[in-house]
């Protein structure tokens, strides 16, 4: 099935497993370069389903079977819009905000932690291994790849100028504070 985001410009490939709409619903959020087909999503999906939860698994934009804008991810900046669209879709089905939970792994965890900056229409967040300090994460990844870490600054500016992405906007601590949540 498909959920529309960004005024219908983005089609999010999704799986919906309905058990009982009066019970909690979990939105499963995958990691970078992954999809809803990932074991990091399929395993919890099976466990949540067996426990009677409703489940919505989405492919973020530029991932899996969803619309590919440019093949890049935006460190949660645009991916949070995908989650907001998924929440809206659930609410249109009659799911109460308090019954909606976000479960994210890696990038999905980061996106879950950043979602309160754009929506508070959900009741809980559970994350596995989210990168919460993006600047440190990028520097460590650059060092791991054998690149000089001083290149962080030009990359940061490039992302802002050419992609319109502010990688330090709505970092998890700030996003959670907007939703009166703590890390």
Regions from the language model: what does each represent?
Residues 104-108, 112:
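Gly/Ala-rich beta-loop-alpha elbow adjacent to hydrolase catalytic centers
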Residues 94-105:
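Alpha/beta-hydrolase fold nucleophile elbow
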Residues 73-94:
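Alpha/beta-hydrolase active-site loop
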Residues 23-31:
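Short beta-strand element of the alpha/beta-hydrolase
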């Amino acid at each position: 099935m498909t959920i529309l985001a960004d005024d219908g410009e983005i089609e999010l490939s999704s799986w919906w497993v309905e058990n009982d709409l009066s019970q909690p619903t979990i939105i499963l959020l995958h990691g970078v370069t992954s999809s809803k087909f990932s074991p990091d999503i399929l395993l919890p999906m099976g466990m949540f389903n067996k426990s009677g939860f409703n489940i919505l698994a989405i492919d973020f934009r530029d991932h899996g079977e969803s619309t590919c804008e440019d093949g890049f991810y935006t460190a949660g900046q645009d991916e949070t819009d995908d989650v907001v669209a998924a929440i809206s879709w659930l609410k249109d089905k009659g799911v109460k905000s308090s019954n909606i939970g976000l479960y994210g792994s890696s990038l999905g965890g980061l996106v879950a932690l950043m979602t309160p900056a754009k929506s508070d229409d959900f009741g809980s967040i559970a994350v596995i291994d989210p990168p919460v300090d993006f600047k440190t994460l990028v520097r460590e990844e650059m060092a791991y790849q054998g690149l000089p870490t001083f290149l962080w600054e030009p990359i940061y500016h490039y992302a802002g100028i050419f992609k319109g992405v502010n990688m330090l906007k709505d970092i998890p601590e700030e996003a959670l504070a907007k939703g009166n949540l703590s890390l």
